[in-house]
């Protein structure tokens, strides 16, 4: 087990999740109509996501950036017939990681790819980089597991940025 400090972005997301939950619990306790079921039922998942990587949330792709991505996406001939409003709605429910990975898939959207710093902006990724450097210095290899394919998708991009060769296996492989 390796202890990892969260980055400031992770700490903020973690704190926000706790604050949302406290507010929802106070609202429920005060007898207010419960709009907070989503907040209270997903708090543990939000905390896990915050502890893993900030790109598991949508905070960098605001509405303006999603609109620009959708407009560029339909510039590709294979997507020219798609409905712009439907794309905006579809993109709005995706995470920053998913949207950046989508942007990587076409030269029309490549300008929307998040920079390496955003992919590396996780305490766990920084600890993993240090461990990889140590393992490689010894001439050894490593095996990385995650319960979330979305985390593995992020790690693949991070490994690419670190220029670490890898083979990925998921339940979809």
Locations of the language-model features?
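Conserved helicase motor "Helicase C" RecA-like lobe of SF1/SF2 P-loop NTPases
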Residues: 133, 137-173
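Amphipathic alpha-helical protein-protein interaction segments
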Residues: 3-7, 33-40, 114-121, 141, ...
